[in-house]
Structures are given as C-alpha cells and as structure tokens.
Amino acid sequence: MASLMRKAAVAPAKATRTTVKASASLQRVAQAAGVAVAGFSLALSANAANVKLGADSGALVFEPATVTIKAGDSVTWTNNAGFPHNIVFDEDAVPAGVNADALSHDDYLNAPGESYTAKFDTAGEYGYFCEPHQGAGMVGKVIVQ
C-alpha cells in the first residue's frame, strides 16, 4: 500500500511539469502569432490602397474614386476590364515640388489584371485621370496624410 501511495504522490508532480511545459508552449505560440500579425500589418501598410480601373458594372470610373493613405504608402491600380486605361497625374493637381510625370503611368494597361503601383512620399492631394476616358468622368484623387 505504501508503494501505491508513492506512485500517487509522484503522478501529480508529473502532471504539474506537463502543465508548465504546455503553458510555455502556448506562450511561444502566442509570441509567434504576435510576430506574424505585426508582419502582416506592415505588409498591408506598404501597399495601403487598391483602385480598380473600371467598375465591376462596366462603368468607366476609378473604384474607389478617392483613397486616403499615409506618406510613404503606395497605391496600386489594377485594370478590372478589357478597356485600355492609364493613370495620369495633373501637374496642377499635385503638391508643389512633386513631379506629376514621374507618378503617372502613360502607357495603357490593356488586359484585366494588369497593374501599376506608385509610392507617395509627400502629404497633400493628388488629382489624376484616365486619358482616354477623362471625358466620361474617369477621374480620381489620392489624399496623402
């Protein structure tokens, strides 16, 4: 009977050690998850906004027409239809000292899925348009805070 009591006394000690190990493992998993979430947040901020060239309905618009980002972030425009589109920044509608031509993508994005990305370092408002569809109202704005 004494040997049974010793075994019973030893068993809880093993369970306690297992609990400590499980707790340490859970702590490592939580830390790894925190690092993964932080990395994902940084990846999202590096490409802060996405704009469709042409609406799902087929309308000749930038969707959304206005995006707001932080200085240092980027905007990606993706052709959503088979129409040729481009992104032209108006030199009179960008902050002083910003080269509108350097931001613009004059070449046409012809196929669905083709994209262009620009990075914005200077705060202010940036007006742009699609050259072949400006008359149809295909204009947009990037607001950089």
Curated annotation (Swiss-Prot):
Residues 1-48 form a transit peptide. The keyword Glycoprotein does not apply. InterPro entries: BlueCu_1, BlueCu_1_BS, Copper_blue_Plastocyanin, Cupredoxin, Plastocyanin. Residues 49-145 form the Plastocyanin-like domain. Keywords: Chloroplast, Copper, Electron transport, Membrane, Metal-binding, Plastid, Thylakoid, Transit peptide, Transport. GO terms for molecular function: copper ion binding; electron transporter, transferring electrons from cytochrome b6/f complex of photosystem II activity. SUPFAM superfamilies: Cupredoxins. Its main location: plastid. Cu cation binds at residues 85, 130, 133, 138. Its cofactor is Cu(2+). It is found in: Plastid, Chloroplast thylakoid membrane. Pfam families: Copper-bind. GO terms for cellular component: chloroplast thylakoid lumen; chloroplast thylakoid membrane. It comes from the Eukaryota. It is a peripheral membrane protein. Participates in electron transfer between P700 and the cytochrome b6-f complex in photosystem I. Belongs to the plastocyanin family. This is Plastocyanin, chloroplastic.
